[in-house]
Protein backbone atom coordinates (compact mmCIF):
# COMPACT_ATOMS: atom_id res chain seq x y z
CA UNK A 1 0.00 0.00 0.00
CA UNK A 2 1.18 3.51 -0.77
CA UNK A 3 1.57 6.01 2.09
CA UNK A 4 -0.68 9.09 2.27
CA UNK A 5 0.56 12.36 0.84
CA UNK A 6 2.80 14.46 3.06
CA UNK A 7 5.33 17.27 2.81
CA UNK A 8 8.99 16.43 3.39
CA UNK A 9 11.18 18.75 5.46
CA UNK A 10 14.83 18.19 6.37
CA UNK A 11 16.29 19.73 9.52
CA UNK A 12 19.94 20.76 9.56
CA UNK A 13 20.18 21.32 13.32
CA UNK A 14 18.38 20.37 16.51
CA UNK A 15 17.14 23.91 17.08
CA UNK A 16 15.75 24.01 13.55
CA UNK A 17 13.94 20.72 14.14
CA UNK A 18 12.48 21.86 17.46
CA UNK A 19 11.33 25.15 16.00
CA UNK A 20 9.55 23.32 13.18
CA UNK A 21 7.87 20.90 15.59
CA UNK A 22 6.67 23.81 17.71
CA UNK A 23 4.79 25.35 14.79
CA UNK A 24 3.50 22.22 13.03
CA UNK A 25 1.38 19.85 15.10
CA UNK A 26 0.85 16.96 12.70
CA UNK A 27 4.53 16.19 12.09
CA UNK A 28 6.38 12.88 12.36
CA UNK A 29 10.17 12.88 12.77
CA UNK A 30 12.05 10.50 10.47
CA UNK A 31 15.16 8.84 11.89
CA UNK A 32 15.90 5.28 10.74
CA UNK A 33 12.39 4.80 9.39
CA UNK A 34 12.18 1.16 10.51
CA UNK A 35 8.96 1.82 12.43
CA UNK A 36 7.64 4.93 10.70
CA UNK A 37 7.75 3.77 7.07
CA UNK A 38 5.70 0.58 7.59
CA UNK A 39 3.09 2.52 9.56
CA UNK A 40 2.85 5.09 6.78
CA UNK A 41 2.40 2.35 4.19
CA UNK A 42 -0.36 0.79 6.27
CA UNK A 43 -1.89 4.28 6.66
CA UNK A 44 -1.94 3.91 10.41
CA UNK A 45 -0.36 7.38 10.39
CA UNK A 46 -1.30 10.29 8.16
CA UNK A 47 1.01 13.23 8.99
CA UNK A 48 1.05 16.55 7.21
CA UNK A 49 4.84 16.68 7.45
CA UNK A 50 7.72 14.23 7.66
CA UNK A 51 10.65 15.91 9.39
CA UNK A 52 13.94 14.25 8.45
CA UNK A 53 16.31 14.53 11.42
CA UNK A 54 19.08 12.27 10.11
CA UNK A 55 21.53 15.16 9.78
CA UNK A 56 21.39 15.98 13.49
CA UNK A 57 24.79 14.51 14.31
CA UNK A 58 24.63 16.10 17.76
CA UNK A 59 22.13 13.36 18.68
CA UNK A 60 24.42 10.48 17.68
CA UNK A 61 26.69 9.50 20.58
CA UNK A 62 27.35 7.16 23.47
CA UNK A 63 29.23 8.60 26.45
CA UNK A 64 29.65 8.15 30.17
CA UNK A 65 28.03 10.74 32.43
CA UNK A 66 27.31 11.42 36.09
CA UNK A 67 24.03 9.55 35.65
CA UNK A 68 25.62 6.49 34.05
CA UNK A 69 25.64 6.17 30.26
CA UNK A 70 24.08 8.80 27.99
CA UNK A 71 22.94 7.78 24.51
CA UNK A 72 21.83 10.18 21.80
CA UNK A 73 18.43 9.47 20.28
CA UNK A 74 19.87 9.12 16.77
CA UNK A 75 22.37 6.46 17.77
CA UNK A 76 21.78 3.42 15.60
CA UNK A 77 21.54 -0.10 16.95
CA UNK A 78 24.67 -1.10 15.05
CA UNK A 79 26.65 1.56 16.92
CA UNK A 80 25.16 0.56 20.27
CA UNK A 81 26.04 -3.07 19.60
CA UNK A 82 29.67 -2.29 18.77
CA UNK A 83 30.20 0.30 21.51
CA UNK A 84 32.64 -0.69 24.26
CA UNK A 85 30.96 1.55 26.85
CA UNK A 86 27.63 -0.23 26.35
CA UNK A 87 29.29 -3.66 26.38
CA UNK A 88 31.04 -3.04 29.68
CA UNK A 89 28.61 -0.79 31.56
CA UNK A 90 25.16 -1.75 30.22
CA UNK A 91 25.46 -5.42 29.23
CA UNK A 92 21.69 -5.92 29.34
CA UNK A 93 21.29 -3.38 26.53
CA UNK A 94 24.12 -4.99 24.57
CA UNK A 95 22.55 -8.45 24.86
CA UNK A 96 19.12 -7.19 23.80
CA UNK A 97 20.46 -5.22 20.84
CA UNK A 98 22.01 -8.39 19.40
CA UNK A 99 18.49 -9.86 19.08
CA UNK A 100 16.84 -6.88 17.35
CA UNK A 101 15.57 -7.48 13.82
CA UNK A 102 18.18 -8.27 11.19
CA UNK A 103 21.31 -6.51 9.96
CA UNK A 104 19.33 -3.97 7.93
CA UNK A 105 17.19 -3.02 10.91
CA UNK A 106 20.24 -2.72 13.19
CA UNK A 107 22.10 -0.62 10.62
CA UNK A 108 19.21 1.82 10.14
CA UNK A 109 17.09 1.71 13.29
CA UNK A 110 17.72 4.22 16.09
CA UNK A 111 17.11 3.92 19.81
CA UNK A 112 15.10 7.16 19.82
CA UNK A 113 12.87 5.97 17.00
CA UNK A 114 12.14 2.68 18.72
CA UNK A 115 11.11 4.19 22.04
CA UNK A 116 9.12 6.98 20.37
CA UNK A 117 7.17 4.35 18.43
CA UNK A 118 6.46 2.51 21.71
CA UNK A 119 5.43 -0.83 20.27
CA UNK A 120 4.62 -3.02 23.31
CA UNK A 121 6.51 -5.92 21.70
CA UNK A 122 9.63 -3.91 20.90
CA UNK A 123 12.89 -4.80 22.64
CA UNK A 124 14.39 -1.51 23.77
CA UNK A 125 11.39 -0.17 25.74
CA UNK A 126 11.47 -3.33 27.88
CA UNK A 127 15.20 -2.98 28.53
CA UNK A 128 14.92 0.71 29.45
CA UNK A 129 11.99 -0.02 31.76
CA UNK A 130 13.95 -2.75 33.55
CA UNK A 131 17.00 -0.50 33.90
CA UNK A 132 14.95 2.43 35.22
CA UNK A 133 16.34 4.61 32.44
CA UNK A 134 15.46 8.27 31.94
CA UNK A 135 14.17 9.73 28.68
CA UNK A 136 15.14 13.33 27.85
CA UNK A 137 12.58 15.25 25.79
CA UNK A 138 13.50 18.58 24.21
CA UNK A 139 11.39 21.37 22.76
CA UNK A 140 11.96 24.93 21.60
CA UNK A 141 11.27 26.10 25.16
CA UNK A 142 13.56 23.67 27.01
CA UNK A 143 14.01 20.07 28.12
CA UNK A 144 12.49 17.72 30.66
CA UNK A 145 13.18 14.20 31.86
CA UNK A 146 10.77 11.28 32.27
CA UNK A 147 11.44 7.85 33.73
CA UNK A 148 10.95 5.02 31.23
CA UNK A 149 8.33 3.52 33.54
CA UNK A 150 6.23 6.69 33.10
CA UNK A 151 7.17 7.44 29.48
CA UNK A 152 5.38 4.47 27.90
CA UNK A 153 1.64 5.04 28.30
CA UNK A 154 0.14 2.33 26.08
CA UNK A 155 0.35 0.84 22.58
CA UNK A 156 2.25 3.36 20.43
CA UNK A 157 1.57 6.04 23.04
CA UNK A 158 4.15 7.98 25.07
CA UNK A 159 4.38 10.95 27.41
CA UNK A 160 5.53 13.24 24.59
CA UNK A 161 3.95 16.67 24.48
CA UNK A 162 3.34 18.93 21.51
CA UNK A 163 6.61 20.15 20.00
CA UNK A 164 8.79 17.68 21.90
CA UNK A 165 11.43 15.33 20.52
CA UNK A 166 13.23 12.50 22.29
CA UNK A 167 16.87 13.61 22.31
CA UNK A 168 18.71 11.49 24.88
CA UNK A 169 18.45 8.36 26.98
CA UNK A 170 20.24 8.15 30.34
CA UNK A 171 20.90 4.62 31.54
CA UNK A 172 22.11 3.87 35.09
CA UNK A 173 25.12 1.61 35.51
CA UNK A 174 24.15 -1.37 37.66
CA UNK A 175 27.39 -2.42 39.33
CA UNK A 176 27.34 -5.90 40.81
CA UNK A 177 24.22 -7.01 38.94
CA UNK A 178 23.79 -10.03 36.69
CA UNK A 179 21.60 -9.33 33.66
CA UNK A 180 19.84 -11.35 31.00
CA UNK A 181 17.44 -10.69 28.12
CA UNK A 182 15.34 -13.43 26.55
CA UNK A 183 12.47 -13.50 24.09
CA UNK A 184 10.40 -15.81 21.92
CA UNK A 185 9.67 -14.95 18.29
CA UNK A 186 7.83 -16.84 15.56
CA UNK A 187 10.71 -16.34 13.15
CA UNK A 188 14.01 -14.48 13.14
CA UNK A 189 13.60 -10.71 12.98
CA UNK A 190 10.00 -10.66 14.27
CA UNK A 191 8.77 -8.66 17.21
CA UNK A 192 8.63 -10.69 20.40
CA UNK A 193 5.65 -12.82 21.31
CA UNK A 194 6.99 -12.29 24.81
CA UNK A 195 10.27 -11.04 26.26
CA UNK A 196 11.89 -10.65 29.66
CA UNK A 197 14.64 -8.33 30.89
CA UNK A 198 16.16 -9.22 34.24
CA UNK A 199 18.77 -7.46 36.38
CA UNK A 200 19.51 -9.06 39.74
CA UNK A 201 22.00 -8.42 42.54
CA UNK A 202 22.78 -11.37 44.76
CA UNK A 203 24.53 -11.65 48.10
CA UNK A 204 25.44 -15.29 48.17
CA UNK A 205 22.17 -16.81 47.01
CA UNK A 206 20.02 -14.11 48.63
CA UNK A 207 18.31 -11.51 46.43
CA UNK A 208 19.64 -8.08 47.38
CA UNK A 209 17.91 -6.20 44.54
CA UNK A 210 16.00 -7.12 41.40
CA UNK A 211 14.54 -5.41 38.33
CA UNK A 212 12.18 -7.47 36.17
CA UNK A 213 10.33 -6.29 33.05
CA UNK A 214 8.37 -7.94 30.25
CA UNK A 215 7.42 -7.05 26.68
CA UNK A 216 4.74 -8.23 24.27
CA UNK A 217 2.39 -9.26 27.07
CA UNK A 218 0.77 -6.01 28.16
CA UNK A 219 -0.30 -2.72 26.58
CA UNK A 220 3.15 -1.34 27.45
CA UNK A 221 6.35 -2.70 29.00
CA UNK A 222 5.35 -4.42 32.22
CA UNK A 223 7.56 -3.91 35.27
CA UNK A 224 6.83 -6.59 37.87
CA UNK A 225 7.36 -4.22 40.80
CA UNK A 226 5.08 -6.05 43.24
CA UNK A 227 6.97 -9.28 42.61
CA UNK A 228 10.30 -7.46 42.93
CA UNK A 229 9.35 -6.04 46.32
CA UNK A 230 8.19 -9.39 47.67
CA UNK A 231 11.32 -11.37 46.76
CA UNK A 232 14.03 -9.04 48.07
CA UNK A 233 15.83 -10.75 50.93
CA UNK A 234 14.69 -14.22 49.90
CA UNK A 235 16.97 -17.05 48.82
CA UNK A 236 17.02 -17.70 45.09
CA UNK A 237 15.97 -21.30 44.46
CA UNK A 238 13.77 -23.31 42.10
CA UNK A 239 10.64 -22.95 44.23
CA UNK A 240 10.98 -19.16 44.40
CA UNK A 241 11.53 -18.91 40.64
CA UNK A 242 8.43 -21.01 39.95
CA UNK A 243 6.45 -18.75 42.28
CA UNK A 244 7.77 -15.63 40.51
CA UNK A 245 6.85 -17.06 37.10
CA UNK A 246 3.35 -17.96 38.27
CA UNK A 247 2.69 -14.57 39.87
CA UNK A 248 3.93 -12.60 36.86
CA UNK A 249 1.80 -14.73 34.54
CA UNK A 250 -1.29 -13.90 36.61
CA UNK A 251 -0.58 -10.15 36.59
CA UNK A 252 -0.02 -9.54 32.88
CA UNK A 253 -2.71 -8.94 30.27
CA UNK A 254 -1.42 -10.43 27.01
CA UNK A 255 -3.19 -9.82 23.71
CA UNK A 256 -4.49 -12.60 21.46
CA UNK A 257 -3.63 -12.25 17.79
CA UNK A 258 -2.50 -14.24 14.74
CA UNK A 259 0.91 -14.81 16.36
CA UNK A 260 -0.33 -16.32 19.60
CA UNK A 261 -3.19 -16.44 22.07
CA UNK A 262 -3.26 -14.75 25.45
CA UNK A 263 -3.01 -18.17 27.13
CA UNK A 264 0.03 -19.10 25.04
CA UNK A 265 1.82 -15.87 25.91
CA UNK A 266 1.22 -16.47 29.62
CA UNK A 267 2.81 -19.90 29.29
CA UNK A 268 5.73 -18.43 27.34
CA UNK A 269 6.27 -15.89 30.12
CA UNK A 270 6.54 -18.68 32.68
CA UNK A 271 9.16 -20.50 30.61
CA UNK A 272 11.13 -17.33 29.82
CA UNK A 273 11.14 -16.34 33.48
CA UNK A 274 12.51 -19.68 34.60
CA UNK A 275 15.17 -19.68 31.87
CA UNK A 276 16.24 -16.13 32.74
CA UNK A 277 16.68 -16.91 36.43
CA UNK A 278 18.49 -20.15 35.65
CA UNK A 279 21.01 -18.15 33.64
CA UNK A 280 21.83 -15.75 36.49
CA UNK A 281 21.68 -18.25 39.38
Swiss-Prot record:
It comes from Sulfolobus acidocaldarius (strain ATCC 33909 / DSM 639 / JCM 8929 / NBRC 15157 / NCIMB 11770). Its EC number is 1.2.99.8. FAD binds at residues 31-35, 110-114. GO terms for molecular function: FAD binding; flavin adenine dinucleotide binding; glyceraldehyde oxidoreductase activity; oxidoreductase activity, acting on the aldehyde or oxo group of donors. Heterotrimer composed of a large chain (CutA), a medium chain (CutB) and a small chain (CutC). SMART domains: CO_deh_flav_C. This is Glyceraldehyde dehydrogenase medium chain. It comes from the Archaea. Binds 1 FAD per subunit. Its cofactor is FAD. It catalyses: D-glyceraldehyde + A + H2O = (R)-glycerate + AH2 + H(+). Optimum pH is 6.7. At pH 6.7, glyceraldehyde is the predominant substrate, however at pH 7.5 the dehydrogenase exhibits activity preferentially towards the aliphatic aldehydes such as formaldehyde, acetaldehyde and propionaldehyde. Residues 1-176 form the FAD-binding PCMH-type domain. One of its GO terms (cellular component) is cytoplasm. The keyword Oxidoreductase applies. It is found in: Cytoplasm. Transmembrane segments: none annotated. The keyword Membrane does not apply. Component of the glyceraldehyde dehydrogenase which is involved the nonphosphorylated Entner-Doudoroff pathway. Catalyzes the oxidation of D-glyceraldehyde to yield glycerate. When the artificial electron acceptor 2,6-dichlorophenol-indophenol (Cl2Ind) is used, the enzyme shows a broad substrate range (glyceraldehyde-3-phosphate, formaldehyde, acetaldehyde, propionaldehyde and isobutyraldehyde), but is most active with D-glyceraldehyde. It is not known which acceptor is utilized in vivo. Pfam families: CO_deh_flav_C, FAD_binding_5. Its main location: cytoplasm. Keywords: Cytoplasm, FAD, Flavoprotein, Oxidoreductase.
Amino acid sequence: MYPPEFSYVRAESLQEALKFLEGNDNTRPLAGGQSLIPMLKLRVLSPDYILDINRLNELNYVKTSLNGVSIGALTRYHDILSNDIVKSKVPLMHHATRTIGDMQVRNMGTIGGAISNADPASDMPVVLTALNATIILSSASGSRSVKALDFFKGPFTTDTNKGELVTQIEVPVLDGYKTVYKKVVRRAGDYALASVALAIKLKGNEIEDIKLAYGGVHDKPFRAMEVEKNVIGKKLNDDLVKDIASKVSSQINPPSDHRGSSWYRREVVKVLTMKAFKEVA
